[in-house]
């Protein structure tokens, strides 16, 4: 039986917008196991990104609990939450969020430096990750010199290089054409299989559903569907 990484217990999130309250999540309960490859699916405003933010410790629920390996994020200080993100989670964003003045190599190296590691100790690890995402011939280029698909490959490598237990991918294919979207999804599927990091997508892209092994559908802040399945076979 797989280890449970994330547990949500009756989680709700309410935002105040002017004088009105907006309920982004309403009584959501679910678990995420180690090595999961899954997605939160739903239209804009359904609560997908809010759910990722709560799991990532970027926001706190209004009511309910978010637990990581049994420890409540609610009880963590800001410093502890920062350490939780730094040590356990890799983030992949729709807009890549690469540092424009850094090369491919330097962008992937950066989270390891934040974790207090010396470049001389991790250079081989970074170069291996660059090779894994097929960018060795671009290793010294800056983000402005790369295509959208290449930038997202850098973001994937940056998320994985610190060997996280969980990767949160917020609309990672939204800015890519169909061919690049499938390439990125196949790559993430292969890396999930190899590195065993759980991956959670937030998406409204139906292409993602071909690859994932579990789909959690959200409507109006509630879970309306939670289905496990066999994803597309990994190409060899």
Question: Language model features by range: what are they?
Answer:
Residues 215-228:
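H-loop (His-switch) and adjacent beta-strand-loop-beta switch element
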